[in-house]
Amino acid sequence: MASISKKIDENITQIETIFGNWSDIVERRFDLDRCAWGDDPAIYVVYIDGLCDHELIENTLIKPITWEWRNKDTADLWEHIISCEGQTADYTQESDMDNVVRAVLRGDTAIFVSGSDQAIVVSSKHFPVRGIEESS
């Protein structure tokens, strides 16, 4: 069982080591001005391209976290993210890196936050719609 570090750079290194040079892995780092956690990126989002609903990720994960954070009075980024996700998406909190990796491989999105030893795993699976085939 690999644990999640409170240092976001350590989590990024773990994810990059596990997934290597996979071309389908999407990693996004966000540094939010109101965070007081030093030089580390405040948020790190990882998912697999093609397995996830991009519109869901952009509109219900990234936009609320990055844009709405600027207008909030809360000093706790973790609580802000949980309140955003609680309103718009199915999510779990995970403290085991192995479980986070398995979730990403299933099509979920993982969000790491500086200063937290947990990740938020958001259900973001996208299944392609197939047309009805004629019987032969």
What positions do the PLM features span?
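Membrane-embedded alpha-helical signal segments
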Residues: 1-136
